[in-house]
Design a protein with these regions (language model features):
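Small-residue-rich hydrophobic transmembrane alpha-helices
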Residues: 57-117, 154-173, 269, 281-341, ...
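Transmembrane helical elements of multi-pass membrane transporters/channels
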Residues: 23-42, 146, 180, 209-213, ...
Length: 461
């Protein structure tokens, strides 16, 4: 079987856990930062379009729910398939691992085409449902329609990258993201300002960039990776059905997490449009963008740790699973403590990245401080969710995805502004309250269920 000889691979079975996680997480961190540029660069440039920047920025924020739905489907098949892929490789069953990857790829492509058609058909009514005013719709509709054309390459680039990382090629995974992100960085000012396409130009630049990333991912997995990608053939369908069920079952937690993020975004925008108007939708767009920036290294550490945890769990090495979980938790908590301090002490610095509008700045500073007041508790949710997903604990992963967002955040988004008369502050305050409650419950449950299982596995060896 052909292998990539010129790229150093990570040995999940041997080597120190800390080095393995860092070797996987650092390239992923670079990749995640570059991936963040897809959306952040758009927002920075859009906010600076003469005369219409603030309104256009809010309009892009109204498109977030649909973009999050696309990410949700990518996670359903990518994050659902990759841990199973790693577990099978840890067991030495590479044939099943390859079938899992191909099943994920086939389902991902099919869902991308269906999703694109549905969203294009209902783009205008969906944006209105999300809280778009007539002014906002003028900017949001063309941006969204162009963005949706790139649904398939966007989902391939996002959903299939975990299978590159799961084979130990984290640097290649980083490179696949870098190609598109750098292209977007170059193309955005060209299409927005030089060609004078405004907000439409931002969408065109993003679609072209996503196409470049997706092309690289397919090329590598088809021709260079150890386990190669292909569509599932008709005669393989019966054999793949069980794998498809397992992929969807495990991926449902990541799917639900992104889907509920979309639902929360819709609810927040609806309440803010009533209690604060269009300017507060722009404020929420900035707050959400800063959250994405802050969370990027956390996602990198999680995704860098996940294949190591899954592989060693499949290989029945509980000591390495436990150590990987502890290392992941320490890295995440240490990083968050630093970023939490910066957000609370220097919010202006972060907001200035997106806009220097005086009225926007005044409202955004207080909103940012409230929103991130208990952000460190969110780490407990991330750690618990990653462990559950990596160990194929489907029910727990799905439950805790739903608990914090659906049963805590969304009700509070309406209760705090209206029932408690907190207005716009209530929308932003719903987040820290949910972090404390949901994060604590998830983490404690993880400790009480996973540690005894690892102890039992150790005794059985």
């Amino acid at each position: 079987m052909e292998k990539v000889k010129y790229m150093k691979r990570i040995d999940f079975e041997n080597g120190t856990i800390t080095n393995n996680i860092l070797n996987a997480a650092i390239p992923m961190l670079v990749a995640q930062i570059l991936s963040l540029l897809y959306n952040i660069v758009d927002r920075v440039y859009i906010a600076r379009i003469p005369d219409v920047g603030t309104n256009a920025l809010g309009a892009v924020g109204l498109c977030f729910p649909i973009i999050l739905i696309m990410t949700a489907f990518s996670n359903l098949f990518g994050s659902g398939g990759a841990p199973l892929f790693s577990i099978k490789r840890g067991m030495g069953d590479e044939k099943s691992a390859n079938t899992i990857m191909n099943t994920s790829f086939t389902m991902l492509c099919g869902s991308a085409i269906i999703l694109m058609c549905i969203c294009l058909l209902f783009a205008a009514p969906l944006l209105t449902l999300f809280g778009a005013s007539d002014t906002a719709l003028k900017y949001a509709y063309p941006y969204l329609c162009i963005y949706l054309i790139g649904t398939l390459p966007s989902m391939i680039a996002t959903g299939m990258n975990p299978f590159i990382n799961a084979q130990g090629y984290s640097t290649i995974g980083m490179l696949s993201v870098a190609i598109g992100a750098i292209a977007n960085l170059i193309l955005d000012p060209v299409f927005i300002f030089i060609l004078n396409l405004g907000i439409k130009g931002a969408a065109v630049a993003t679609v072209i960039s996503q196409l470049m990333s997706a092309s690289f991912v397919i090329y590598f997995l088809k021709f260079k990776a150890e386990l190669k990608i292909s569509f599932i053939r008709k005669n393989e369908l019966p054999h793949c059905l069980n794998f498809a069920k397992d992929i969807i079952s495990l991926g449902t937690s990541g799917f639900v997490m992104q889907l509920t993020n979309s639902l929360v975004s819709i609810c927040c925008n609806n309440v803010l449009s009533v209690t604060g108007g269009d300017i507060y939708i722009s404020v929420m767009t900035i707050v959400s963008s800063i959250r994405q920036m802050v969370e990027t290294p956390i996602y990198a550490i999680n995704e860098g740790s996940s294949p190591i945890i899954s592989y060693n769990y499949g290989a029945k090495r509980p000591g390495r699973v436990r150590k990987a979980g502890l290392t992941m938790g320490a890295l995440i908590l240490g990083y968050t403590a630093v970023m939490w301090s910066i957000i609370l002490l220097a919010p202006h610095m972060l907001i200035n990245i997106f806009s220097s509008d005086t009225s926007l700045m005044e409202n955004a500073v207080s909103a940012l401080k409230i929103y991130f007041a208990a952000f460190i508790f969110m780490d407990l949710q991330y750690i618990g969710q990653t462990i559950f997903k990596s160990l194929n604990k489907k029910k727990q992963a799905i439950f805790f995805s739903l608990l914090r967002k659906v049963f805590i955040v969304i009700p509070l988004t309406y209760i705090m502004p209206y029932a408690l008369n907190m207005g716009t502050n209530g929308v932003f305050a719903a987040e820290p309250v949910s972090n404390i409650i949901g994060g604590s419950i998830c983490f404690i449950t993880m400790l009480c269920t996973i540690l005894p299982e690892l102890k039992q596995m150790e005794n059985d060896r």
